[in-house]
Amino acid sequence: MKKHLLALGLLLAGVSPAQALDVGDISSFMNSGSSTLSKTIKNSTDSGRLINIHLERLSSPLDGGQVIPMDKPDEVLLTPASLLLPAQASDVIRFFYKGPADDKERYYRIVWFDQALSDAQRDNANRSAVATASARIGTILVVAPRQVNYRFQYANGSLTNTGNATLRILAYGPCLKAADGKECKENYYLMPGKSRRFTRVDTADKKGRVALWQGEQFVPVK
């Protein structure tokens, strides 16, 4: 499921993905016990970059998710929303959730508009920095319900999320297929109401292990 989250939507104009701004993980999670989140971004190029950031709420982070209205104008705040990032420099962007304290999980797309800068005019009277290349990057912010209810069911190598918050699930142990080698590992995000079957790890083997993360709490399942 992780690969189906709305991943980096990189719409490039004159830059390659390797040159674009490094914004860290594609999916970020704000757990129920926290109302703040920090993301470190890095400019690994040799030129300064102008970064503008905004958020939009999504009906779902999966393919087909639509942009929907916020419950309130200041539902999620961020700072700074615009910055100049020198070459080889990094900075921290902070997000603050101010929305309803209910039992709903919420999803947001963080849109990073990244422009490279160059000195286009140089003389004693006039010097200006002009954007020469740009990239639009989309990542996902998941805000867990303030009234969280973690629940799941496991049977025959399949996990079902019966709670109201996304789980990070994993399995590791002997591979189900000899062609995959001896040891395999699987990691997925499992949204509320969804099920996932492990297809590479032999979870029926006594050495096969299944576990999950409920927020920051690690929970062995099998």
From Swiss-Prot:
<dbReference type="Pfam" id="PF18649">
    <property type="entry name" value="EcpB_C"/>
</dbReference>
<dbReference type="InterPro" id="IPR008962">
    <property type="entry name" value="PapD-like_sf"/>
</dbReference>
<dbReference type="InterPro" id="IPR013783">
    <property type="entry name" value="Ig-like_fold"/>
</dbReference>
<comment type="function">
    <text>Part of the ecpRABCDE operon, which encodes the E.coli common pilus (ECP). ECP plays a dual role in early-stage biofilm development and host cell recognition.</text>
</comment>
<comment type="similarity">
    <text>Belongs to the EcpB/EcpE family.</text>
</comment>
<dbReference type="InterPro" id="IPR040695">
    <property type="entry name" value="EcpB_C"/>
</dbReference>
<keyword id="KW-0732">Signal</keyword>
<keyword id="KW-1029">Fimbrium biogenesis</keyword>
<protein>
    <recommendedName>
        <fullName>Probable fimbrial chaperone EcpB</fullName>
    </recommendedName>
</protein>
<keyword id="KW-0143">Chaperone</keyword>
<feature type="signal peptide">
    <location>
        <begin position="1"/>
        <end position="20"/>
    </location>
</feature>
